[in-house]
């Protein structure tokens, strides 16, 4: 499960088996893992994060969307 980036307490990653789905990113903090689609950026699964934190994560993903998409393309184009 390749880690694309770590920002503060959040680890942004995808699973190697995610190839057959549209581009997305998982974000983990402690025992919570949420999933966001990347095109357009939107929440797919909240992973039991609270709404306020999900909004904060959404902004981080929007700010790093290009990097996350490049990481996705790079990994899954192999």
Predicted regions and their residues:
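Short, charged/polar N-terminal "headpieces" of proteins
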Residues: 1-21
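Generic preference for hydrophobic/aromatic residues in regular secondary structure cores
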Residues: 4, 43-45, 64
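Short leucine-rich amphipathic alpha-helices used at interfaces
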Residues: 5, 31-32, 75
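Compositionally biased, intrinsically disordered low-complexity segments enriched
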Residues: 7, 26-28, 66-67
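A short, structured beta-strand/loop element
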Residues: 15-51
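C-terminal structural segments of small proteins and small subunits
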Residues: 51-78
């Amino acid at each position: 499960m390749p880690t694309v980036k770590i920002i503060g307490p959040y680890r942004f990653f995808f699973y190697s088996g995610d190839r057959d789905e549209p581009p997305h990113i998982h974000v983990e903090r402690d025992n919570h893992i949420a999933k966001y689609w990347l095109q357009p950026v939107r929440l797919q699964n909240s992973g039991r994060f609270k709404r306020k934190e999900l909004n904060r994560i959404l902004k981080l993903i929007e700010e790093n969307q290009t990097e996350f998409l490049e990481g996705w393309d790079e990994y899954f184009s192999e």
